[in-house]
């Protein structure tokens, strides 16, 4: 009798995706981040669900309800900090996952890559709205500053901002709708992740060499199920180290002050995972220009397949491109640092140079490096 997992309509889908899936024999730990992102998403949905049971999306009580969760709800503090630091782990995994895709040329799978970019945007939007919910000082002013950027759009900008706010400032209506959107968005992200996987399984995984691996495939289970489980154990370890020892390490102290529209904090800044984009936004003196640069800093990922000039897919055998890639990583770390600094000398000029470098490396230096490498192959 044939195995039930190969015949049952539902189990067949799971079987083809996680058990009998043919996988390359040489994919490294950089290929673990996809499953880790799935774990992060499930964890965020579960902790978020339990937080939503005790949270009240109202300007009068939001801050108090979060305090109530931490003080009075059984294990509320651990749920709250797992959710807050879970977002940080989520973005660490996201950046690693995207970095892996850039390094090994995974962007050649166009549909998978483009849905991945949409997923990145959706996750960033969701995280932003989540940061507003505790209704601390940084929540309120972060929401005010970032939503206000839309007013830079010519003609319809001001109307658009007031429409999003549901009034003439960030207020009760804004908080309520942000809570609604923050609740629904992870389920949309989960659905998109399914489509992401669907397209990936049409082609099969890439591998570090960038060479087709049809000749040497192994079953996903047990080889990569055990590897994923190890990655998951390390992810949970790192998350719980953060949660149990330094839960506020990545947060902003200003968010422990209730939101006050009459008092602006001296340095408005987003969570650490948005700082690189925030630095690019601030480095351009023009409002609309800054907003465009902010959007393009992420949207530029869509252009990666067009900017690929190399004869090889992966960077594994391309030392000049490797150099460019790691300079780009260093540049992003520099931008992250600058994003958290006040707008004063020398941070302004460093931010501007790092922003120029970011676009220059991606649009010019990496494609040129690839062409040089192609020519070196002829020697």
From Swiss-Prot:
Annotated residues for binding of heme b b562: 83, 182
InterPro entries: Cyt_b/b6_C, Cyt_b/b6_C_sf, Cyt_b/b6_N, Cytb/b6-like_sf, Cytochrome_b, Cytochrome_b_C_euk/bac, Cytochrome_b_N_euk/bac, Di-haem_cyt_TM
Residues annotated as binding heme b b566: 97, 196
Annotated TM spans: 33-53, 77-98, 113-133, 178-198, 226-246, 288-308, 320-340, 347-367
A Pfam cross-reference name: Cytochrom_B_C
UniProt topology in membrane: Multi-pass membrane protein
CDD domains membership: cytochrome_b_C, Cytochrome_b_N
Subcellular locations according to the entry: Mitochondrion inner membrane
Keyword Kinase: no
Gene Ontology biological process terms in this record: mitochondrial electron transport, ubiquinol to cytochrome c
Keyword Transmembrane helix found: yes
PROSITE patterns, A to Z: CYTB_CTER, CYTB_NTER
Domain of life, source organism: Eukaryota
Residues given in the record as a ubiquinone binding sites: 201
Cofactor(s), by name: heme b
GO CC terms, sorted: mitochondrial inner membrane; respiratory chain complex III
A GO molecular-function annotation: metal ion binding
Matching SUPFAM superfamilies: a domain/subunit of cytochrome bc1 complex (Ubiquinol-cytochrome c reductase), Transmembrane di-heme cytochromes
PANTHER family named in the record: CYTOCHROME B (PTHR19271:SF16)
Subunit structure: The cytochrome bc1 complex contains 11 subunits: 3 respiratory subunits (MT-CYB, CYC1 and UQCRFS1), 2 core proteins (UQCRC1 and UQCRC2) and 6 low-molecular weight proteins (UQCRH/QCR6, UQCRB/QCR7, UQCRQ/QCR8, UQCR10/QCR9, UQCR11/QCR10 and a cleavage product of UQCRFS1). This cytochrome bc1 complex then forms a dimer.
Misc: Heme 1 (or BL or b562) is low-potential and absorbs at about 562 nm, and heme 2 (or BH or b566) is high-potential and absorbs at about 566 nm.
Protein known as: Cytochrome b
Organismal lineage: Eukaryota, Metazoa, Chordata, Craniata, Vertebrata
């Amino acid at each position: 009798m044939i195995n039930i997992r190969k015949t049952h309509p539902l189990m067949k889908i799971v079987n083809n995706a996680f058990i009998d899936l043919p996988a390359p024999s040489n994919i490294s730990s950089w290929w673990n981040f996809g499953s880790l992102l799935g774990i992060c998403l499930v964890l965020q949905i579960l902790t978020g669900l339990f937080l939503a049971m005790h949270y009240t999306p109202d300007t009068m009580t939001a801050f108090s309800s979060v305090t109530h969760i931490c003080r009075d709800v059984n294990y509320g503090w651990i749920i709250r900090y797992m959710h807050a630091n879970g977002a940080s782990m989520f973005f660490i995994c996201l950046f690693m996952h995207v970095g892996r895709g850039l390094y090994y040329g995974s962007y050649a799978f166009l549909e998978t890559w483009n849905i991945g970019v949409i997923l990145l945007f959706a996750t960033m939007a969701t995280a932003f709205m989540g940061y507003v919910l505790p209704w601390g000082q940084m929540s309120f002013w972060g929401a005010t500053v970032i939503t206000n950027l839309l007013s830079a759009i010519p003609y319809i900008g001001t109307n658009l901002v007031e429409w999003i706010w549901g009034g003439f400032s960030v207020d009760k209506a804004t908080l309520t709708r942000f809570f609604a959107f923050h609740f629904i968005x992870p389920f949309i992200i989960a659905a998109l992740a399914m489509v992401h996987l669907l397209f990936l399984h049409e082609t099969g995984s890439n591998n570090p060499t960038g060479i087709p691996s049809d000749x040497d495939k192994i079953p996903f289970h047990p080889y990569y199920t055990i590897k994923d489980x190890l990655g998951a154990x390390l992810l949970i370890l790192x998350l719980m180290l953060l949660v149990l020892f330094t839960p506020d390490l990545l947060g902003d102290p200003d968010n422990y002050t209730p939101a006050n529209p009459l008092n602006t904090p001296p340095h408005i800044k987003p969570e650490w995972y948005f700082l690189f984009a925030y630095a690019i936004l601030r480095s351009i003196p023009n409002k609309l220009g800054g907003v465009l640069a902010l959007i393009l800093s992420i949207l530029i990922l869509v252009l990666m397949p067009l900017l690929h000039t190399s004869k090889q897919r992966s960077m594994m055998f391309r030392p000049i491109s490797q150099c460019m890639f790691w300079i780009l990583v260093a540049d992003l770390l520099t931008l992250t640092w600058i994003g958290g600094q006040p707008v004063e000398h020398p941070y302004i000029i460093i931010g501007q140079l790092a922003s120029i470098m970011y676009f220059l490396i991606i649009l010019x230096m990496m494609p040129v490096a690839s062409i040089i490498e192609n020519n070196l192959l002829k020697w």
